[in-house]
Amino acid sequence: MSTVVVKGNVNGGVQQPRRRRRQSLRRRANRVQPVVMVTAPGQPRRRRRRRGGNRRSRRTGVPRGRGSSETFVFTKDNLVGNSQGSFTFGPSLSDCPAFKDGILKAYHEYKITSILLQFVSEASSTSSGSIAYELDPHCKVSSLQSYVNKFQITKGGAKTYQARMINGVEWHDSSEDQCRILWKGNGKSSDPAGSFRVTIRVALQNPK
């Protein structure tokens, strides 16, 4: 009976040498292809905008709740050639209830920064006469003292007063008047004259 010697080169039941196993692992690793990421041209990356920590710093103007600025318009109608009267700007301005009984009562202080006085003529071409007007910046005069400034009854006109002319630079307590405009006509009582249209700009602060 002859004996056959089998060397370790057969796969069945016999382990391969370590050198061959290393070579096979290297071959498998070489077969793996790297993945390449392709970015489409012409598409720039988006950059995130950094927002400031305090957005309120961008706001300008008067903060809410501290002050306000309003414009009021009122009229004085049915004037005749010899009409006379006055506008006292402040809590005594009965011709403008929205200002006197409205917003003025909601603040401790105010100042009227401009006044536009307009006379709208409704007189006929045959009427004669004029309406004189005068500014009293400190409410010291109760009747017209000057006849220098006038509106012709048949033509009308307008006059603008800025803050420095009407005592409107400093703040006033809401319980006191700021200034006054007086007016008086020298025409006939039977002649229709027209109407006044008054526009005021008011600044207010320190709400109640």
From Swiss-Prot:
User: Which top-rank group of organisms is this from?
Assistant: Viruses
Instruction: Kindly give the InterPro entries that the UniProt entry links to this protein.
Output: Luteo_coat, Viral_coat
Question: GO cellular component terms?
Answer: T=3 icosahedral viral capsid
Pfam families annotated for this entry? Luteo_coat
Spell out the residue ranges making up region: Disordered. 1-69
Q: What is the protein's major site of localization? A: virion
Give me the stretches of Basic residues compositional bias.
Answer: 17-30, 44-61
Q: Where in the cell is it found?
A: Virion
Family designation: Belongs to the luteoviruses capsid protein family.
In Swiss-Prot or TrEMBL terms, this protein is called Major capsid protein
Q: What is the lineage of its organism?
A: Viruses, Riboviria, Orthornavirae, Pisuviricota, Pisoniviricetes
